Structures are given as structure tokens and as C-alpha cells.
């Protein structure tokens, strides 16, 4: 019985060490590949038109910059843009936990005056 416990414990430890979702740095979507880390910095974009922030309010934190991973980190930041709360972050990008583009994506069209409660570009 104790051999079974030891084997299961070692297998679990190996799985956690190799899995990017638990801190292993062996790939992922911009988070791995040579110990690159993705740093997210949200930039508040002025909202034009009638939206939740009113006229000229800063309620659309949509643009994310990432460093130092170059194009891989930019792709990770763009894919995770909808799930990031305001603030500055330094974390590994794990797309299966961070992608949710259902509502907060950029609004395009209608001349930039906003329809349906959000300002457009």
C-alpha cells in the first residue's frame, strides 16, 4: 500500500511539474519557450458616444501591451484581452483559462457613436 502511495505521489508531482497550468514553463501560448514571461499593461482608451462612462469617459480598457516576448506575447495578450481586469499584471498566459471574448471585444462600426450601450471606434 505504501508503494502505491509513493508511486501515485510521484506521478502527481511529475504531472504538476510538466503542466503549464500549474507553473511548469514548457510551452503554452506565449508563456513558455525559454522562460519568457508575459506582462500585461492595460491602457485606458477614451470612450466616445453614449456608453457606460458617459461622454468621453474612460470605461474601455481594451489595449494590452506585453513584454518581453515579442510577437508570441502580443498574441497572448490579444487573445486574453477580454478576461483581464484593470491593473498591471505579470503572469503566464494560459489561453484555456483566460480567453473570453464574448462581450468586451472592441466595438466596430456605426461611425463611432455607439449603439447598444457601448461606444464604437
Curated annotation (Swiss-Prot):
Residues 1-18 form the signal peptide. Its main location: secreted. The keyword Secreted applies. It is found in: Secreted. It comes from the Eukaryota. Disulfide bonds: none annotated. Transmembrane segments: none annotated. GO terms for cellular component: egg chorion; extracellular region. InterPro entries: Chorion_2. Keywords: Secreted, Signal. Belongs to the chorion protein S15/S18 family. Chorion membrane (egg shell) protein; plays a role in protecting the egg from the environment. This is Chorion protein S15. It comes from Drosophila subobscura. The lineage of its organism: Eukaryota, Metazoa, Ecdysozoa, Arthropoda, Hexapoda.
Amino acid at each position: 500500500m505504501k508503494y502505491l502511495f509513493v508511486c501515485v505521489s510521484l506521478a502527481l508531482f511529475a504531472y504538476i511539474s510538466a503542466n503549464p497550468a500549474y507553473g511548469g514553463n514548457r510551452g503554452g501560448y506565449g508563456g513558455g519557450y525559454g522562460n519568457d514571461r508575459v506582462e500585461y499593461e492595460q491602457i485606458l482608451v477614451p470612450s466616445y458616444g453614449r456608453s457606460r462612462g458617459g461622454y468621453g469617459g474612460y470605461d474601455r480598457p481594451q489595449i494590452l501591451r506585453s513584454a518581453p516576448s515579442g510577437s508570441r506575447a502580443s498574441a497572448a495578450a490579444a487573445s486574453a484581452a477580454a478576461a483581464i481586469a484593470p491593473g498591471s499584471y505579470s503572469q503566464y498566459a494560459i489561453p484555456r483559462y483566460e480567453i473570453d471574448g464574448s462581450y468586451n471585444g472592441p466595438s466596430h462600426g456605426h461611425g463611432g457613436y455607439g449603439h447598444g450601450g457601448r461606444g464604437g471606434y
